[in-house]
Amino acid sequence: MLSILKKLFGTANDRTVKKLFSEITKINSLEPAIQKLSDEELKNKTVEFKEKLKNGATLDDIVYEAFAVVREAARRVCGMRHFDVQLIGGLILHRGMITEMRTGEGKTLVATLPAYLNALTGKGVHVVTVNDYLASRDSASMGKIYNFLGLSVGCIVAGMPDEAKRAAYNADITHATNNELGFDYLRDNMKYSLQERVLRPFNFAIIDEVDSILIDEARTPLVISGPVNDNSELYGKIDKIVRMLNTSDFEKDEKLKTINLTETGITHIESLLSKEHLIKPDTGLYDFENLTLVHYVNQALRAHNMFTVDVDYLVREGKVMIIDEFTGRVMEGRRYSEGLHQALEAKENVKIQNENQTLASITFQNYFRNYPKLSGMTGTAMTEAPELKDIYNLDVVAVPTHNKVTRLDLDDEIYGSKKEKYDAILKLIKDCYDRGQPILVGTISIEKSEELSSVLNKEKIPHKVLNAKFHEQEAFIIAQAGRFKAVTIATNMAGRGTDIMLGGNPEMLIEQLDEDHNYETKAAEIKAQISEEKKQVIEAGGLFVIGTERHESRRIDNQLRGRSGRQGDPGKTKFFLSLDDDLMRIFASDRISGVLRTLGLKDGEAIHHPMISRSLEKAQQKVEGHNYEMRKNLLRFDDVMNDQRKIIYEQRTEIIKSKDSHGFLNSTTEELAKKIVLTFMPVGSYREDWDIENLSVELHRVFSMKFDHNLVSKNDVTEEEITKIVIQTAHDIYKSKEEAYSSELMHNAVKYILLTTLDQVWKDHLYSLDHLRQGISLRAYAQKDPLSEYKREAFNLFEQMLNNLKELFIQTVYHFHIDLKHIQKEDVSLEHKKLQKNMRESREDPAFSKYNAGSSLETDLKPVVSRVDPKDRNPDDPTSWGRVSRNELCPCGSGKKYKYCHGANE
């Protein structure tokens, strides 16, 4: 019934596209007039548009004319004219939606339309791609259009210095990778001045391969971390022990990707740990004193049994490198967290790097939700439309192709074993190769790629292998996969970003030439050869795409299919499956095996059956649903941290912008002073209950004050009066610092202390949240909702962090010392980095000028003394020693630390 209604009235997508086609006529009607403009007049349209926007016009008021201008500029500069369907794609992107356009439909050119239009506001546009190569390529090729129209273009790639990044981000349109954008956002929020930051405020982002970035990579947070304690030796010992376990010692669930020790496994591993003296003979692994070892054991178990080399990671140059399960690419600079990476390094017997502590992190889900306006484009998004709408509030519109798709998608062939499947694949490859038809074989892992490659080598069939191990050659290899007799094996084709042109890509081949006197001749020969090969390939049937097994996601399978049949080219696709494939074995084996038994499948025979196709689709839907729930759950938890992150980053920015740091200092000083006094002299308490001894200790610890006990002996003194005196004295102490150093220097010092203290407590807070998150799922056993528990405890931790911030900040302000000897007199403002260096030398050993306010409290301060070179110290003359650290050996030559010798009374 539903299908009949759709045929009668069309789908919602059909109606949207039909409406957009009516708008395209408005753009097309402007084309004749725009074409008559001179280059100078066409360029001046940008100035005209900006003037209109300044006078109150909106982007929607100028959208049709702006698109017509970009179309004409592209025709003149690049020789490319936007098709009507590309204009539709541009309108969809401008309106903050996702456009699904088939491979080869010119998504890169489509992005120029909304990028130009939105850049006219002067707030910047980010065009996001999945790797540096694509960012550089697109900024260079499409940048010609923007530059012609008077807009600036920037490109961000890994390893650029901040100055270059800042200039690129300040351009009207910036091409960048999703990783660099996320990391730059985190880095900016660790800087100490606004001038050091590279990013501008968020405005508009166009994401290429949007499904890859917002869905496939959604579960992988970007993390900036620093090293913690070195436990490499322990990882090595645990690895040796785990290797001795039997398969009966643990049980794993491949669907849920979990692994746990069995009862016999616990007994076995406790015995092994005891022999290695890692636990005492009379204790168990789960005894309180041994609980830290559980973490190491679990990660070693996962490393050996849930992660496979050349599938989940590869080892290159003595390093374990993560492979993106969706794209087959190496994830440069990424490491598994929670000790898993160290466990893998121990497993592969390479150098074990230190564990890292998180300093800052964010998921792509929360990073991209910062943009007020977000859009994206991809060849495959409709299958994930509900998730994109639910999480990012992005609608998906499928745009029809410019030319009709003539590709033939053949039915899957299912075999009983992997060997039979490979035999069938080999037979087809041989047939295509003999006829000259180019073949692209898609695999789901590097391991499978190399397995198939070795089979082809034995048969002496020349071929290219494209996977994470040869990332540098990726674009060139894939661009030539459409040549006559070409055989290309590739891991997942998601996000490759390079078209496969039948006959090959002449431009890329020409780029390989040396510019000698024969350059033009050789270039012409290449073009002629490619043109001839294109005819031969079309006659042979176009590109034949072979899938060696189904992926968990239908979308990834569709991306592989989409490599064939670009822009109306002929082509074929076919998937070969076996009961040994992971997806079949884990999710659909029982049902399909039953069908095969019923049908009486013989060795070497293939089967085509609608029930099997339905079972496979259900299995994929089941996995997709499971992964969606995992991403949604991750987001619910990450939103808790994201709310806190926003507060901290906003506060940090306010501190940096602040021209007067005294407000927070004074209010916090008063708050802590009251808190300390009331802790030891509670309101309404008797005098004999006052804890004056500990009050003195606490005031000394926080404010470096000496409390006059005689003050309490006055009969009429109250806790309120004591509080007022403490507050006033604290303010006076600070004023004495301003007199000693200058108010501007102190302002910068206080601001710097506040920023560094905030960074420290935030880092510790992230560490606490990580630990809370790891164990929170166990609350479900106590009939408690883990998410609610996480929210509650995360809020308590956040409050605790803010209290720690205040105390640590005040304590540091009242105890720090600046070594004036290392500061030039004219440099009153003092750069943060120089201040950091001087403060690090002295924070452990506060020393100040003597101060007495004439009140009953006096400060425990010393004269400001600079450091002296040890060789200039006279052991018999303490006045020549200068400032001595309390932990240094005493200059008198006694051999004792200074704090136990001449510094004992300080």
Swiss-Prot record:
Q: Which GO terms describe its molecular function?
A: ATP binding; metal ion binding; protein-exporting ATPase activity
Domain of life (superkingdom): Bacteria
The catalytic activity of this protein is classed by the Enzyme Commission as 7.4.2.8
Residues of the signal sequence? none
Query: Which InterPro entries does the record cross-reference, listed alphabetically?
Result: Helicase_ATP-bd (IPR014001), P-loop_NTPase (IPR027417), SEC_C_motif (IPR004027), SecA (IPR000185), SecA_CS (IPR020937), SecA_DEAD (IPR011115), SecA_motor_DEAD (IPR014018), SecA_preprotein_X-link_dom (IPR011130)
Q: Which residues bind ATP?
A: Q86, G104, E105, G106, K107, T108, D499
Summarize the subunit comment: Monomer and homodimer. Part of the essential Sec protein translocation apparatus which comprises SecA, SecYEG and auxiliary proteins SecDF-YajC and YidC.
Describe the task this protein carries out: Part of the Sec protein translocase complex. Interacts with the SecYEG preprotein conducting channel. Has a central role in coupling the hydrolysis of ATP to the transfer of proteins into and across the cell membrane, serving both as a receptor for the preprotein-SecB complex and as an ATP-driven molecular motor driving the stepwise translocation of polypeptide chains across the membrane.
Name this protein carries in UniProt: Protein translocase subunit SecA
Per the UniProt record, the lineage of the source organism begins with: Bacteria, Pseudomonadati, Pseudomonadota, Alphaproteobacteria, Rickettsiales
